[in-house]
Regions:
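Acidic, metal/ion-coordinating pockets
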Residues: 1-228
Length: 228
């Protein structure tokens, strides 16, 4: 499993992502990657390690705690010129087993973590996104308790669910088992107000496979078979 996880982490270098949120089933693996012993060397091989976030992962002294959030500044011709780019803050949380705090799961209760950190992040960014490994019901509770949040991405729904608006917070769900590709588009007017459009596309046989991704997958499978 460790070799398989390494290959997945390396894929995030080939197809970069801005943020990696720790999910409930990822907590053990995340702590192995964040172990202080050899961290610099691992992060050089797998830079995605530096993009791991979690506001409620509890770690011991032998592990370097991930930041609770990251801020990415973006710019473009459709973003009103304010002398700087648009600062997007990503806060990562996950729902512990049983929905509350359980020391055996190395987690802190995610609702308390969000309430504590959302005001801090809100002061630093223009758009606040919570990436939450939880279901739609708890994502709605996060929105109710943290009305300063602009967008919540719920990444553990039981099935494909339509977007939901709670106050001014826009909630979208990631499709389970990578069955669909989500596309969330944000529109910023001249007054600095956001509106959203969400599309979800079936990843079926009608969607052509990327040749580079197919070649990478074949190489990964060959490597895993060699290690078995």
């Amino acid at each position: 499993m460790s070799a398989q996880n390494d290959l997945v982490m390396k894929s995030f270098n080939r197809w970069p992502v801005d943020v990696l949120n720790v999910g409930r089933s990822d907590s053990v693996a995340a702590q192995k990657y964040l172990a202080r012993d050899g961290l610099s060397a691992r992060a050089e091989m797998m830079p995605a390690i530096r993009r791991i976030v979690s506001a409620n992962l509890r770690v011991g002294p032998e592990v370097s705690a991930p930041p609770p959030y990251l801020i990415k500044e973006v710019s473009g011709p459709r973003i009103p010129n304010r002398g700087r780019g648009l600062k997007v803050g990503f806060l990562g949380v996950f729902e512990p087993r049983g929905g509350g705090e359980n020391p055996g799961d190395s987690t802190r209760e995610m609702f308390a973590a969000a309430r504590r950190l959302v005001p801090e992040l809100r002061a630093k960014c223009d758009l606040l996104v919570v990436v939450a490994h939880t279901d739609l019901k708890n994502a709605a509770r996060l929105a109710e308790e943290n009305p300063q949040v602009d967008v919540i991405i719920a990444s553990n729904p039981p099935n494909v669910l339509p977007p939901r608006q709670v106050g001014k917070t826009f909630i979208v769900c990631a499709a389970p088992a990578n069955t669909q590709q989500g596309d969330l588009r944000l529109y910023l007017d001249k007054r600095g107000r956001f509106s959203y459009k969400f599309m979800s596309t079936d990843l079926d046989a009608l969607v052509p496979a990327d040749p580079e991704a197919l070649a990478y997958t074949a190489a990964v499978l060959e490597e895993l078979n060699r290690l078995r």
